[in-house]
Amino acid sequence: GWYLRNDIIWAKNNPMPEAVKDRFAKAHEHIFLLSKSPKYKFFYEEVLEPYTEPLNRWGGDNFNDAGQEQTKYGEGLAKELGYSHQNKDGKGKNVRPNPNGRTRKDVWKLNTSSYAGAHFAVFPDTIPELAIKAGTEQGDIVLDPFMGSGTTAVMATRLGRKWMGIEMNEEYAEIIKDRTSQLEMF
């Protein structure tokens, strides 16, 4: 079996229009993060997102005379995190938990993409890019069981991963051949 680790929502900023009158028009898709075991690779630092402006005001950029970032945290925690406790006037700022960004949320607001000759539901490159960075290391193999237009294969190659894919639709398989033949493989 599989373990469901995340049910990520892809909230489409520009969904295909639907002429429906008995329900709301669909503007999202589910992306499932599955693992084969309870312990699995997840490289969250590879997919951090920038802090929002309110969080930027909340923390960071308060340095002492030695150039060390300062915080209002207690002295012990500040030292453990590598920050000085406060500046010379006794005031500090709360320092962001991770200076590289914050943990990505499970709702991704992204536009759909297009590829000449491809079907309507082309993922933006960002979706497989985030999944590949979060779950694999360079040289790993990425499996795409529903290749569509081959976006995951393209991103896997760009990120230094090998890939295998399955696509039953012959028209899409031709698109995949065209897209992947242009890639510089290992």
Task: Locate each region found by the language model.
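Core catalytic lobe of class I
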Residues: 1-180, 185
